[in-house]
Amino acid sequence: MKGKFRFSLKRGLLRPSWNKYNIYNIARKQLPALNNRTLYQKKWNAKKETRSYHGPQLREYQLKNAFRPKLEGVISSLDNKLPIPFMNQTYAFLESRLDMSIHRALFASSALQARQLVLHGKVHVNGKPERRAYRQLLPGDLVTVDQKSVMNCVSASSNNTPSIQDGKQTEQVSSKDGENEKKKDNDDDLFEQTSNGKLPSINETISNFVPKPFMSLMAFIPAYLEVCFRTCSFVYVRDPVARPGLTEVPSPFPEDLHALAYTYYIRSRNMRQGAARCQARRLIPQKVRDASFYQGPPELYKKRNVSPKEAFSHRYPVRQGKLTKLV
């Protein structure tokens, strides 16, 4: 079954990918006209535009469950009076995901491809294999990706096989004597390398690296990652924050559009929490649910059908004993 095509030129939604159709959509992208729309329509359109770029590999309920209303920012100095773009931090909680951080480190051409690397067991976190693409990285976590898989994902050339095998195939000689002699020489060289503890490195075995076309548009590394391309690993230093006039969350959309998306998600979050509270009140009575009100079995709180005579006697009790005579 053919996969769904995510780079529609008609819809023009942006994706975190190096695909040529996505780059074309970025080049001709225009902000949606929200003048003659209601407030809810503005929020919905802003959510649709920003949601396609931030976390397209997630379902809507997954993003709503992981949404964090708290937006983090820092002030560098008192002299810098530029406003802090807090609203651009709406999707900052997605940047700590394992698959998204691999894409930001330029080890995969898209977030979906980074997720595929994690599911196939090509990623190690702190020296241990990790198959959960939704894992939230903590500051100081070391992520290592398989080098050959990175070359297959990032390089445009299909000839990424080791050069040792290519050398064996190209150095074939018609005579059997020449083949035996060269095989012996190669075996002796490999034996010397292994005995001395020197194996061919990844730079020597992999053919020439050819970057993918249109890669330069997204070839940047955020400030919260420290990347080492020689070992295909990176360190998640800290969570992204907003500074005066600067945000560390990469996004092609302005702050106003992120503000509308933030109000949409914060409204849906409050509605879900309110519905959960109402459901809890309907299912569990307040006197049974709260320990301060509970003072016995539930039968004590059920109302009894009392006759008016009994109610009057309870209100105005009559002394049953006889009065003593006064002498």
UniProtKB/Swiss-Prot annotation:
Annotated GO CC locations: mitochondrial small ribosomal subunit; mitochondrion
Regions of compositional bias (Polar residues) in chain numbering: 156-173
Key words of the record: Mitochondrion, Ribonucleoprotein, Ribosomal protein, RNA-binding, rRNA-binding
InterPro entries named in the record: Ribosomal_uS4, Ribosomal_uS4_CS, S4_RNA-bd, S4_RNA-bd_sf
One GO process term, biological-process aspect: mitochondrial translation
Pfam families: S4
CDD domains attached to this UniProt entry: S4
Cysteine disulfide partners in this protein: none
Region span, Disordered: 156-199
Superkingdom classification of source: Eukaryota
GO molecular function: rRNA binding; structural constituent of ribosome
Ranges of Basic and acidic residues composition bias in the record: 174-186
Ranges of residues in domain S4 RNA-binding: 96-154
Main location: mitochondrion
Subcellular location: Mitochondrion
Assembly notes: Component of the mitochondrial small ribosomal subunit (mt-SSU). Mature yeast 74S mitochondrial ribosomes consist of a small (37S) and a large (54S) subunit. The 37S small subunit contains a 15S ribosomal RNA (15S mt-rRNA) and at least 32 different proteins. The 54S large subunit contains a 21S rRNA (21S mt-rRNA) and at least 45 different proteins. uS3m, uS4m and uS5m form the narrow entry site of the mRNA channel.
Family: Belongs to the universal ribosomal protein uS4 family.
Function field: Component of the mitochondrial ribosome (mitoribosome), a dedicated translation machinery responsible for the synthesis of mitochondrial genome-encoded proteins, including at least some of the essential transmembrane subunits of the mitochondrial respiratory chain. The mitoribosomes are attached to the mitochondrial inner membrane and translation products are cotranslationally integrated into the membrane.
Name this polypeptide is given: Small ribosomal subunit protein uS4m
Taxonomic lineage: Eukaryota, Fungi, Dikarya, Ascomycota, Taphrinomycotina
GN (gene name): nam9
